[in-house]
């Protein structure tokens, strides 16, 4: 069976990648990632039961989160690392099974009826005759890459034959992947929430349950949105408690003459460690793409060698990494297949990886030694200037709510007629230029609220301000879409409205990968309707599942700039 992947917006032909991923992943990588998801589901079968009888699940929790994150689009292309993850997962699964037995429980209901009946029901075990047959995800075993390869042939997306059930299972899985990404960042800062792990396990096991109806899976998808809000709130708390609340900041986009390190991705803990370790070395630090919002946090402003932001969204990295001249640290997705001209200057860390690229692991205490990349930087030329000037950002919920009287007054007087939430992702497709044209064409009495790398389509345009309020308010990274929700809920309260949809806010969101999926599900949970997704609707939505989203939530897509602006403004 050939590979099949349709988890990102650029899925080939709007249907799915079957030969090689548009992202660059090979068939082997794609299938190994399928197997990792299968292993994680098997672990969830046991860890949910270990959790139920009160035993420690921290090792399994960490593995599930990191494994889901490692399969996000453009995160990890290292076959050796991915196969090692499969091997580690099988060991963790066995340790959970052993823990159940040691505690006097059983994974077989014949030995212990008291707490395994629920366990068996979610596995699709329908009668006593089948009770000895634990789901294959919890039972299969292998110990080498060749056996993994054979197993991977049988567990891909298309193993679920019913199109609608498959669609709902994948929608749920992609929501979990986005959730895992945000939870991993919070965990790195010492913040966690057991209920989120418990839901992830429940949802993973549910994707194996052939007895669940489409309605039951739909309910789980919507519940996923509830935990999406929870995980974004947790990460917001982790980030702001550790580094302070983002504040209005002018960010330099030019360069200096010192050698530099370019840090990309989302992990602020890595950002902190790099800034600490480069201080006093003569090496400057620049952010790239989704790391731009690090410039908004007070804790990072004390570092004089933190210069600003270099470049644009992730998909332009081939040219921009080449021009940077110094080493690049990828803390998370998005990785584009590196050019030979800079591959030896590229480093990965965390769940990311690319074959032939140096990887920096954390020690047992979670610390990372960046000395190698720092010494590498010292041997490199300073970055080539590709832009100059400044951009402004830092409009997360705390900062915007501090401006609430000014914003509310502008709305009441009619100076601001409408807000447009244009959060989300950027990508390669030329059709995404729609978002630049849309921003340019918006009436002058409108304000864009953004988060995520979608901002790069318009954050360098001169769109002016309204009574001193910039017409583009950048809250931060994609997870900071949470800030936009907090702002909307506060405005609902201020204007004493019954329904969040009564606010003069329209949602025109550009999506790309699985973190955008959890953001969407979170917005749906909060009751937001009439969200428009583009540049295309997800390939993983079957016609019937898409119909559910359209009929119940008013989900739509984009058409032309003029038609859409007219529709939104009316």
Curated annotation (Swiss-Prot):
Enzyme class: oxidoreductase
Disulfide links within the chain: none
Top-rank lineage group of the source organism: Bacteria
List of residues binding [4Fe-4S] cluster: 5, 8, 17, 23
Cofactor remark from the record: Binds 1 [4Fe-4S] cluster. Binds 1 hybrid [4Fe-2O-2S] cluster.
EC number(s) recorded for this UniProt protein: 1.7.99.1
Cofactor(s) for this UniProt protein: [4Fe-4S] cluster; hybrid [4Fe-2O-2S] cluster
Residues given in the record as hybrid [4Fe-2O-2S] cluster binding sites: 266, 290, 334, 425, 453, 478, 513, 515
Any one GO BP annotation for this protein: response to hydrogen peroxide
Free-text function comment from the UniProt entry: Catalyzes the reduction of hydroxylamine to form NH(3) and H(2)O.
Protein name per Swiss-Prot or TrEMBL: Hydroxylamine reductase
Protein's gene: hcp
